[in-house]
Amino acid sequence: MSSHQEPVVLGKLGASHGIKGWLKITSYTDSVEDIFDYSPWLIKEQGEWREVKVAQWRYQGKAIIAALEGVTTRDQAQMLTNCEIAIPAEAMKALPEDEFYWRDLIGCEVVNTKGYKMGKVDQIVETGSNDVLLVKANAKDGFGKTERMIPFVTEQFILEVNLAEKQILVDWDPDF
């Protein structure tokens, strides 16, 4: 791979299906079919990324299965079970202004309007109504917090996201 950025994981190869090398696909994309908008895929085998192309895919009941070029037997498919499916970071679709990929928010420092450093985004939780930042508090948090949950609601709680500085400005009480 030519990129210095870590590939973006979009899913995982599941169990083999049938005798012709098809595999079940677990997709982490918003719509499960969106994983097929990207080509080629990178799969991680024995710690190394390698390129593969999808020859064809289809629904099998509620599951999605795919045939990969060069994988023509059940034994070959079984060797790929549980491999991650990724794409180069630069292949990600551009987002409109004020929309962000979760992976870009992870690790950002969260600071409130009074300049208090609340910690770093550890993960993001999807709740249905809005996403929530799980912020791991700094070791010497002045309010005794170990983590904070801040709704990702722009203009109300999230005032500014500066990816270049890896910083998120929030209107949030550090004691909450």
Swiss-Prot record:
GO aspect biological process, one term: ribosomal small subunit biogenesis
Instruction: Provide the GO MF annotations for this entry.
Output: ribosome binding
Query: Where found?
Result: Cytoplasm
Q: Which Pfam families match?
A: PRC_RimM (PF24986), RimM (PF01782)
* Superkingdom in the source lineage: Bacteria
Q: Where is the PRC barrel domain?
A: 97-176
The GO cellular component terms are:
cytoplasm; ribosome
**Which keywords are on file for this protein?**
Chaperone, Cytoplasm, Ribosome biogenesis, rRNA processing
In which family does this protein belong, per the annotation? Belongs to the RimM family.
NCBIfam families reported for this sequence = 16S_RimM
Purpose of the protein: An accessory protein needed during the final step in the assembly of 30S ribosomal subunit, possibly for assembly of the head region. Essential for efficient processing of 16S rRNA. May be needed both before and after RbfA during the maturation of 16S rRNA. It has affinity for free ribosomal 30S subunits but not for 70S ribosomes.
Domain-level remarks: The PRC barrel domain binds ribosomal protein uS19.
| Oligomer status and interactors | Binds ribosomal protein uS19.
Q: What is this protein called?
A: Ribosome maturation factor RimM
Q: List the source organism.
A: Shewanella loihica (strain ATCC BAA-1088 / PV-4)
Q: What lineage does the source organism belong to?
A: Bacteria, Pseudomonadati, Pseudomonadota, Gammaproteobacteria, Alteromonadales
